[in-house]
Amino acid sequence: MSALIDFYAKHSRLVDQIGINAILALSLSVSLQAGQLALAQAAFMGIAAYVSTILALNAHWPLLATIVVAVLVSTVVAAILAYPVRRLRGVFLAIATIGFGEIVRVIANNLKITGGAEGISGIPNDATTPVIYGALALVALVLFLLSKTKFALAVALVREDEYAARGVGIDVGAIRTLSLALGGAIAGLGGALYAHASFFITPTDFGFARMEQILVWCVVGGVTSPVGAVLGAALLSVLPEAIRFLADYREISNGVILLAVILFAPGGLSSLWRARRRTAARRVTRAAT
């Protein structure tokens, strides 16, 4: 126990970062599971971060209230965004949503209320480790419960074959909108927590580099696996710290891991676990016969 306490004392920021990154990875995983390469999570994250920060500093709202409002705002923005991009697929959807993210970043960069390029400092550090991991557990629970519903089946069918989904009466547009809105809500939660776990935020915190980072976590873990998304986020959050002794060269670690996964495990790290389970099941079946 003392060893854990010592570890947390030295690496508390990393522990918090892993929890927030896992939430952000789950937000993108929701969209990817619906077959949507919608890359606006960093924008939703930024919108919620600024809403939560402004309410905390200007209106002196408590943490929970600022998070609730921030999540609602990011959810509404995501649902609105879903309408103009509803006919886009693949790379065209990716480009459109990246463009939306850049619009959000530029607006934040030029507004007085967001602090412009200098950002906002003095944010209350209210997002403690229990709060962050409580939020992560809540997101995981909601996604688990949803995975047991007809909505999850509809999402899977839309991802695999939209025409077949329409043929059995599924409203593809509604599924895509709900998936993007849910992803926006989760990203908003991550953004609000990020703001309250940091002393300051700037528009560059929510630019394309952040979106690229979230996407890499999901690809490394497995694009259709929520567990894989969390695994990818945790691994790629810890790795740069673990190889800090490599100085500047540690920045290429994510790229090396991504390349290795694409070459040797295209389905992500979670696919290796699934393959191992299938192999074990076959061995049990053979032994039984």
Description of each model-found segment:
Residues 9-17, 122-142, 200-201, 250-254:
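Loop-to-helix entry region at the N-terminal start of transmembrane alpha-helices
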Residues 128-202:
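Helix-loop-helix "hairpin" substructures at the membrane interface of multi-pass membrane proteins
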Residues 8-58, 80, 84-93, 222-226:
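Single transmembrane alpha-helix segments in multi-pass membrane proteins
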